[in-house]
Amino acid sequence: MNDSQTIIDAGKEFDFGKTSADYARFRDIYPDVFYEQLTSRNLCINGQSVLDVGTGTGVLPRNMYRFGAKWTAVDISAAQIEMAKLLSQGMDIQYLVSPTEKLKLPKGSFDVITACQCFWYFDHEKTAPLFHSLLSPGASLAVMCMEWLPYEDTIAGASEELVLKYSPQWTGAGEIVHPIRIPECYSDHFETVFHNEFKVKVPFTRESWNGRMKSCRGIGASLSPAEIEEWEKEHIQLLSEIAPERFDVLHYIAFVELKSKIT
């Protein structure tokens, strides 16, 4: 879901901290080509200071750490950050618990800001000027996502229908390949310089795909434990009927780079 004008799940509350264990286990699934979108643009590499907003369990900084950048990562959920710290042992990554909109960090202190799988959650009227102030002049804001394609992949479509059965207000359904929408308020502070969208097959087992779906906002982050258990039983049965033990799910990757305007 990339349209920031959509009211997420019709206002239904969600908390990814409720699903941190599954999130950590089943959502570190991005292929190498996902991270290459950054390095091919000379982003998040040696000598750069990077801020990852909406970091979740730290998937992006952990996987990009090998390229030599200095990472700071923030998330609103203390549970997600605790899991990120656990998974990042031995890595020099600074983690902070804060809403992105309320970040208190030195102005001009970052060469890159990344927003992976989270951009649509922000209050953009606040984050657009905030991101500009945190970046050095001419630095980059990189926004990324990877979504399954329910109309092109039978297994993804069937799993998505089951999520909607239990969470009909969930607005994460119905993805098609499209550029990430950047709200107009960013144009005062940034210029879009590059974007890319392409399809990719991501490998799963029945267990890992069930875990990926269970950790989505419409299930693990918003349903009660009893509802999650009921959904999972039905989903496991569904997969036993429609999916082999190992299979690929068709996704698309979208990436956009914005340059901070020099004022």
Task: Spell out what each predicted region is.
Residues N2-I45:
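Conserved class I S-adenosyl-L-methionine
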